[in-house]
Swiss-Prot record:
<dbReference type="Pfam" id="PF02565">
    <property type="entry name" value="RecO_C"/>
</dbReference>
<dbReference type="GO" id="GO:0006302">
    <property type="term" value="P:double-strand break repair"/>
</dbReference>
<keyword id="KW-0233">DNA recombination</keyword>
<protein>
    <recommendedName>
        <fullName>DNA repair protein RecO</fullName>
    </recommendedName>
</protein>
<dbReference type="GO" id="GO:0006310">
    <property type="term" value="P:DNA recombination"/>
</dbReference>
<dbReference type="GO" id="GO:0043590">
    <property type="term" value="C:bacterial nucleoid"/>
</dbReference>
<comment type="similarity">
    <text>Belongs to the RecO family.</text>
</comment>
<dbReference type="InterPro" id="IPR037278">
    <property type="entry name" value="ARFGAP/RecO"/>
</dbReference>
<keyword id="KW-0234">DNA repair</keyword>
<dbReference type="Pfam" id="PF11967">
    <property type="entry name" value="RecO_N"/>
</dbReference>
<dbReference type="InterPro" id="IPR003717">
    <property type="entry name" value="RecO"/>
</dbReference>
<comment type="function">
    <text>Involved in DNA repair and RecF pathway recombination.</text>
</comment>
<keyword id="KW-0227">DNA damage</keyword>
<dbReference type="InterPro" id="IPR012340">
    <property type="entry name" value="NA-bd_OB-fold"/>
</dbReference>
<dbReference type="InterPro" id="IPR042242">
    <property type="entry name" value="RecO_C"/>
</dbReference>
<dbReference type="InterPro" id="IPR022572">
    <property type="entry name" value="DNA_rep/recomb_RecO_N"/>
</dbReference>
Amino acid sequence: MQTKETRGLVLYNRPFREDDKLVKIFTETSGKHMFFVRHATNSKLSSVIQPLILANFILKINNHGLSYIEDYKGVSLFKEINADIYKLAYATYLVSLADAAISDAVYDAPLFAFLIKTLELMDEGLDYEILTNIFEIQILDRFGVQLNFHDCVFCHRVGLAFDFSHRYSGLLCPEHYEKDLYRSHLDPNVPYLLNQFQTLHFDSLKTISVKPDMKQKLRKFIDEVYEDYIGLRLKSKKFIDDLDHWGQVMK
């Protein structure tokens, strides 16, 4: 086992035996690992093994089995996220998506930084739905999916009223719509925004303003992408869908 001090984000915990817990932590320097916490209820670690806790951990890391938490310091809480059921649901989906995107024990500091920055912006009050869309689009490559939202796959022209073709995994301009009779028939603003999302750097993001009807169109198309290209069905995503449904019913 290696002893390391590293920043880490708690993804989730689950009961193990009577009073023990298994805790999944995404670390900045060693990827994701499962940690065993004995007698978790009365442990000094009890407050720091909750989901969405960010801290500097001292860890004993085992690449071929359970790892152990030695100590911690510098705990950060996403207070605004935890105080809002919608933000919490979307944040939980993000960490589930990051967990699914890479294997355990795989170093991926860029994904770690991207996840933390997304959660920080969400906690600061930026639109959690659009932040989630941006995250979903930018981590597609972690699932081995490369989609072109920039130019027509046939003539490579840009700035037109594009539609998306699942057949060609990219955009069709009006002159090439006929290449795919089953094209998506998208609002042209959807591929335009997805192209922006694909290359956006959060350091330059100060505000987000997207109309509700466009959010629905983005959500529908991104769901289709994840279904058709990845086949991913996360419980946390279903919870969001159910929550949004009941939110509409209650209006």
